């Protein structure tokens, strides 16, 4: 199990990827305590002085002008959590819940939320015990924060709701006991601090980012294999071509292709003196298209890395000045826009891959047997696999429609503009699944094409990619049940089997 000492506000993308991938044992850095305690003291002073402060001794949303009596403050926080736990849909998996919880711990621990260490420690104990609250997938519009998902997360702290432990659902009180905890009574401001924030939206988008990174790496490897299978040229990857344009993503992508393709191979030498002048765009323009995708990944990663370390609570407690300020950091518009940009990249990765599949199957373009199979007519080969790839790529065109431009007023028009960041993030997973399927078919097709080059080898790194597939899926010598081959290739890609072929430092979290 990964051990992490959390210094609030310093989580890296690599750490976030690791937290999403596997259980973690978390410890809060001792340096966090003074700021946390100071924010709590500030809230307590406001109550003692009987000052009005939103979320501490008032109602919420449109009810913000309703003053709450001191004897009702604890009940106010409990009622908030119970009433806001109104999500719907399938429960989030453990990996995503863990990431949401760590993001919330990270935010609360920065000391601007007025929440006691006791509550933060309880969340840490749940993470360390691998006790994951039941959080439904749907119910947040990404402003005012992710209220419903985070309310479901917080229910367990109160002894309400349920949690999953080692794959089994348990009542909250039993789940708390496993973590060595008892139900908490929330103090003033604490329920709101737990519920308000962009942590679910950010986790949704981070998962999409991590998946998109793996897809980018797989597409570079599969695209390189396709260049070789279709007897493409290495010239379009020449560094000089890309330096004069100056687009960093394009420059770095071309370098990745040069690293994978090498200077030459048996395949490239076999057509050294051919009369082809230029390759089709799906081969030749890979650095330009995939470079643009890499730029989107990097820009989204920057936004999400900042948001993962942000304080997105409301109101914020500035203990040094004794101020409590209502703002709008809960509005997840930056996350929604980042997710929209990731959607464009995921869609384009799949779209370009599908075109390379089609190219390889066309004997006039690739000089390979029609549909990548010998004895065509009797055998249909990759004919319908390409149709599947086309269907998946087309689905992603619709799914890539931006969500950040959508809004629907809530809370009686008090919350009159929202981000739709959760929807923007979660559709990335379906898009990634679609593009993974397209890339799996290209991987199969490119390796098939190379097999049909009668024993010629490609570069050392691309041979690794080829053998990674051939260790699971044999050559397609005659028609057979095709779907299992695609499923095996998809499974390999989902495990990141081709991600390690890229040079270090290209992708934001790797």
From Swiss-Prot:
Intracellular or extracellular location(s): Cytoplasm
Matches recorded under Pfam families: Lyase_aromatic
PTM per Swiss-Prot/TrEMBL: Contains an active site 4-methylidene-imidazol-5-one (MIO), which is formed autocatalytically by cyclization and dehydration of residues Ala-Ser-Gly.
Location (main, coarse): cytoplasm
NCBIfam families: hutH, PRK09367.1
Associated pathway: Amino-acid degradation; L-histidine degradation into L-glutamate; N-formimidoyl-L-glutamate from L-histidine: step 1/3
Gene Ontology terms: cellular component: cytoplasm
MF annotations from Gene Ontology: histidine ammonia-lyase activity
Protein name: Histidine ammonia-lyase
InterPro entries: Aromatic_Lyase, Fumarase/histidase_N, HutH, L-Aspartase-like, Phe/His_NH3-lyase_AS
Transcription regulation listed as a keyword: no
UniProt keyword terms in alphabetical order: Cytoplasm, Histidine metabolism, Lyase
Catalytic activity: L-histidine = trans-urocanate + NH4(+)
Residues recorded with modification 2,3-didehydroalanine (Ser): 144
Family: Belongs to the PAL/histidase family.
E.C. no: 4.3.1.3
């Amino acid at each position: 199990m990964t051990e992490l000492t959390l210094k609030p506000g310093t989580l890296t993308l690599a750490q976030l990827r690791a937290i999403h991938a596997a259980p973690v044992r978390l410890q809060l850095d001792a340096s966090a305590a003074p700021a946390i305690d100071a924010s709590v003291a500030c809230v307590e002073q406001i109550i003692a002085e009987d000052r009005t402060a939103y979320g501490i001794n008032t109602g919420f949303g449109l009810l913000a002008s309703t003053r709450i009596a001191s004897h009702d403050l604890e009940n106010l926080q409990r009622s908030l959590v119970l009433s806001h736990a109104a999500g719907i849909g399938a429960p989030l998996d453990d990996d995503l819940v863990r990431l949401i919880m760590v993001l919330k711990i990270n935010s609360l621990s920065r000391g601007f939320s007025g929440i006691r260490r006791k509550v933060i420690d309880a969340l840490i104990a749940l993470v360390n015990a691998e006790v994951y609250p039941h959080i439904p997938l749907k119910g947040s519009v990404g402003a005012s924060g992710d209220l419903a998902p985070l309310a479901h997360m917080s229910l367990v702290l109160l002894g309400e709701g349920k949690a999953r432990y080692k794959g089994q659902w348990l009542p909250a009180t039993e789940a708390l006991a496993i973590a060595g905890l008892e139900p908490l009574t929330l103090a003033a401001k604490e329920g709101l601090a737990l519920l308000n924030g962009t942590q679910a939206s950010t986790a949704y988008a981070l998962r999409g980012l991590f998946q998109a990174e793996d897809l980018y790496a797989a597409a570079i490897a599969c695209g390189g294999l396709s260049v070789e299978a279709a007897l493409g040229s290495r010239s379009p990857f020449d560094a000089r071509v890309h330096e004069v344009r100056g687009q960093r993503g394009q420059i770095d992508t071309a370098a990745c292709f040069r690293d994978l393709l090498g200077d030459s191979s048996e395949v490239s030498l076999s057509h050294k003196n051919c009369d082809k002048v230029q390759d089709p765009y799906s081969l030749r323009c890979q650095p330009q298209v995939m470079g643009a995708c890499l730029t989107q990944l990097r820009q989204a990663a920057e936004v999400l890395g900042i948001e993962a370390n942000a304080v997105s609570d409301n109101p914020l407690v500035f203990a040094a000045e004794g101020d409590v300020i209502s703002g709008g950091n809960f509005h997840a518009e930056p996350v929604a826009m980042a997710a929209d940009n990731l959607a464009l990249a995921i869609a384009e990765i799949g779209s370009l891959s599908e075109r390379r599949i089609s190219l390889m199957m066309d004997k006039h373009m690739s000089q390979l047997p029609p549909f990548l199979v010998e004895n065509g007519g009797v055998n249909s080969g990759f004919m319908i696999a390409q149709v599947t790839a086309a269907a998946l790529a087309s689905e992603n065109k619709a799914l890539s429609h931006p969500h950040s431009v959508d809004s629907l007023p809530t809370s009686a028009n008090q919350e009159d503009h929202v981000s739709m960041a959760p929807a923007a993030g979660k559709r990335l997973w379906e898009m990634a699944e679609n593009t993974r399927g397209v890339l799996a078919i290209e991987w199969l097709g490119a390796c098939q094409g190379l097999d049909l080059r009668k024993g010629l080898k490609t570069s050392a790194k691309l041979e690794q990619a080829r053998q990674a597939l051939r260790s699971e899926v044999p050559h397609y010598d005659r028609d057979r049940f095709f779907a299992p081959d695609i499923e095996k290739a998809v499974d390999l890609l989902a495990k990141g089997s081709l991600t390690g072929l890229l040079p270090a430092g290209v992708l934001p979290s790797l």
